């Protein structure tokens, strides 16, 4: 069995069906003896260019180990499913189980956002104390 990285884009009007689609595709791979090494739902994102006048899509990425037969069946499912607007299959030398760069960047962005929001509350509390101490220093003079 070979390793593949599969990314498919789902029409934004069909975003609520992504869970069922992923379940169907993973079942197809596992029934043929394959393994899902990584599954990431990147959510709805802006496309770099419009595809059939659609500017956003729901992205899903899978790293799988499967047979050529299962992969061909999966590609047929993509081809005949109108909700899948694009797909990409890349052959890999080995299984990739770590987080993708896309997911890491998203987590870093959310962590920075949390850190940015947190100090505002902490600074205002600390700032009040320092202002009071400065005022008391000035009162002594």
From Swiss-Prot:
Annotated Basic and acidic residues bias: 103-124
PROSITE patterns to which the protein is assigned, alphabetical: RIBOSOMAL_S6 (PS01048)
Signal peptide boundaries: none
Highest taxon in the source lineage: Bacteria
InterPro entries: Ribosomal_bS6, Ribosomal_bS6_CS, Ribosomal_bS6_sf, Ribosomal_S6_plastid/chlpt, Transl_elong_EF1B/ribsomal_bS6
Keywords for this protein: Ribonucleoprotein, Ribosomal protein, RNA-binding, rRNA-binding
GO cellular component: cytosolic small ribosomal subunit
GO molecular function, one term: structural constituent of ribosome
Region (Disordered): 97-141
Chain intervals with Acidic residues compositional bias: 125-141
Biological-process GO terms, alphabetical: translation
Function: Binds together with bS18 to 16S ribosomal RNA.
Family: Belongs to the bacterial ribosomal protein bS6 family.
Family annotation (PANTHER family): MITOCHONDRIAL 28S RIBOSOMAL PROTEIN S6, SMALL RIBOSOMAL SUBUNIT PROTEIN BS6M
Listed name of the protein: Small ribosomal subunit protein bS6
Organism annotation: Pseudomonas fluorescens (strain ATCC BAA-477 / NRRL B-23932 / Pf-5)
